[in-house]
């Protein structure tokens, strides 16, 4: 399951570093590995692309669901995310500003539902909820 970091890199495929992400995704797909595009990661990336007026990157993002599995947020995901957030707060593990919606707990809830590993640039906070690994560590 893609976190917003790798997803953002996949949409900005023109930069040399980002070609690594494209090659990585292609290798996974060539070996029939299920790759998931969670709605919350789409939201995080999309809002920044809109602000920056990156229409080419938006087109790349829009094309991804034809290649990989798009995962909409469900009510059950939001309930699980609330549970994860509350448990984390009660045990003293910060998940960000309590007044803000936390995308990481929503992403974690989606990954839990699907039994997926999150491919990310930043394992930190996600690892307290679900299996999360650096994208480059997820190999065939």
Annotated model-derived regions:
Residues 1-37, 47-63:
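Short, well-structured N-terminal submotif of metal-dependent ribonuclease cores
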Residues 6, 41, 77, 107, ...:
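Alpha-helix capping/helix-boundary segments
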Residues 27, 108-140:
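Acidic, PIN/NYN-like endoribonuclease modules and their adjacent C-terminal/linker elements
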Residues 27-28, 64, 88, 129:
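Hydrophobic helix-cap positions at the C-terminus of alpha-helices
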Residues 34, 67-69, 131, 136:
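Conserved beta-strand segments of alpha/beta enzyme cores
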Residues 40-88:
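Active-site-proximal, substrate-binding regions of enzyme catalytic domains
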Residues 69-117:
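Active-site neighborhoods of divalent-metal-dependent phosphate/nucleic-acid chemistry enzymes
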């Amino acid at each position: 399951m893609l976190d917003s970091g790798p997803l953002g890199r996949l949409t900005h495929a023109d930069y040399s570093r980002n070609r690594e992400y494209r090659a990585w995704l292609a290798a996974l797909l060539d070996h029939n590995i299920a790759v998931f595009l969670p709605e919350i990661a789409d939201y995080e990336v999309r809002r920044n692309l809109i602000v920056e007026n990156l229409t080419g990157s938006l087109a790349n993002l829009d094309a991804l669901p034809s290649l990989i599995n798009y995962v909409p947020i469900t009510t059950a995901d939001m309930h699980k995310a609330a549970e994860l957030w509350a448990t984390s707060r009660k045990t003293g593990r910060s998940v960000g500003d309590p007044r803000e919606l936390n995308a990481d707990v929503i992403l974690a809830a989606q990954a839990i539902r699907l039994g997926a590993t999150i491919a990310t640039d930043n394992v930190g906070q996600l690892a307290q909820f679900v299996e999360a690994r650096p994208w480059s560590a997820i190999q065939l």
